């Protein structure tokens, strides 16, 4: 049988309190919890999945970034507008892509861009 890669599920630093991070990602960013055990949890939204890991090492979070393509970028920007996070402007970049950045309370940076 030929080897075929499936999906990628990045490990996402959650900060020192996993429950606070879960609350942010579930109630704020619209993910759903798939599982939780000990210092880890799995979250998912529309096929995009992460494994949250409780950690106290801020440099990991400050150096973690993820780029996620979405349909409905304008609506997502409005949805995330009231989050307790740093939200950058929604803008067209010089390379021709509309996007915005969000920095979660843990320090993780998300770049969201319009698909198509």
What would you call each of these model-derived segments?
Residues 62, 74-79:
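Short amphipathic alpha-helices within nucleic acid-binding modules
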Residues 1-22, 66, 116:
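N-terminal beta-strand motif that seeds the catalytic metal site of vicinal oxygen chelate
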Residues 1-3, 77, 81-116:
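Vicinal oxygen chelate
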Residues 32-64, 109-114:
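Conserved short beta-strand elements that form part of the metal-binding/catalytic scaffold
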Residues 40, 49, 67, 87, ...:
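Short hydrophobic/aromatic beta-strand element in the GNAT-like acyltransferase core
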Residues 3-6, 58-63, 93-94:
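Short glycine-enriched loop/turn motifs at secondary-structure junctions
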Residues 27-33, 84-85:
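Conserved acetyl-CoA-binding loop of GNAT-fold acetyltransferases
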């Amino acid at each position: 049988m030929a080897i075929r890669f499936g999906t990628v599920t990045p490990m996402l630093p959650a900060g020192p309190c996993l429950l606070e991070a879960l609350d942010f990602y579930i109630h704020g960013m619209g993910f759903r919890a798939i599982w939780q055990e000990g210092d880890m949890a799995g979250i998912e939204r529309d096929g995009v999945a992460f494994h949250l890991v409780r950690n106290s090492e801020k440099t990991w979070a400050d150096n973690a970034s993820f780029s996620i393509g979405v349909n409905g970028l304008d609506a997502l920007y409005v949805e995330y507008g009231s989050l307790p996070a740093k939200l950058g402007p929604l803008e067209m970049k010089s390379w021709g892509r509309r996007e915005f950045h969000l920095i979660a309370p843990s320090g993780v940076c998300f770049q969201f861009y319009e698909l198509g």
